[in-house]
Amino acid sequence: MELVQNNSIVIPPKSHIEQSYGPFYSSQDIYDEINIGSESTFTGSYTFAGVQSEKITINRGCNIAGFGVFSRGFCRNIEIHSDANIVGPYSFQYCSYLNSVQVHENCRISGNHTFSGCGIRELHLGRGIKVFGTGTFYQCENIEHLEIPDNAFFDSIFTFAKCVNLKSVRFGNNVILYGHSMFSSCESLEAVYFGDNVSIYGEDNFNGCPNLRIIEHGANFLNEDKTLRIFEKPYKRVRFEEIPEGVECSIRMESFDENSVIAQTTCGHYFNEDGLRNWVRQNDTCPMCRKKMKC
């Protein structure tokens, strides 16, 4: 079977690759892409380890089960399509030139240290992703901002530990985390935002994050990690139709509309949330009545 087409390595759909190492292992040739056809399975190890390729595409429903299949490669971009299953440990470990990773919806990553030590700068995770195992993105030092999508599920340890330049994490809605030390030693981390219906179990998930100052959460937030101390906001979001007619934001001196993000303080006043958030960071009283709002 001819696997090299137009300077790309192309694996046909529904292939089953059992061979370890093989002809492409640490090849000196430079390829445009490694394209794994949909519903293919890899059980061999280090099949494409050390290969120089601009991009790796893993198509829908693939199962990558071997050890280090793409590890130590020189690729810049990885795209993993929906319903793929990355089971094998060290699958992309030490791809130090890697710039962006896009994982589409409903993928499962369960191999230990799948992306550890990679040069990832842009990480896009799809809805419904499931992550298991140890150190999935351990020591990916170039990630600065991270978004965890809606309906994500994590049952893992040291998942993003030692991502030392990570500054902010924003969780979507309906996210469940069972973990230990998931974000430990992320020493640049400053802000974490949890969406609605987020649940956290385990402990030490944000241990060793000395610069973490902002922790905000939405409705129905459940925190069972006793090492993560949450300071409740002195206000809550409300819908436009819930506020009295004619009320204005006294910080920005403007009327609300259907597109406004409105916050109501514990003392009953209404403000634009961004303006109130900035106020609360510097003050401990309501901008309207000066009532003390937090300790």
Where are these regions (language model features)?
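C-terminal capping region of solenoid repeat domains
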Residues: 209-210, 214-234, 246, 268, ...
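Consensus positions within tandem repeat domains that build extended binding/scaffold surfaces
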Residues: 45-47, 67-69, 89-91, 112-114, ...
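RING-type zinc-finger domain of E3 ubiquitin ligases
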Residues: 242-295
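Short, conserved catalytic or adaptor-binding loops enriched in Gly and charged residues
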Residues: 3, 25-28, 229-231, 255
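Eukaryote-specific detector of the first structured module of a protein
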Residues: 17, 22-25
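Short coil/turn segments at secondary-structure boundaries
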Residues: 47, 69, 91, 172, ...
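Disulfide-bonded cysteines in secreted/extracellular proteins and peptides
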Residues: 95-98, 115-118, 140, 163, ...
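Structural signature of tandem-repeat unit edges
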Residues: 2-16, 28-42, 52-63, 73-86, ...
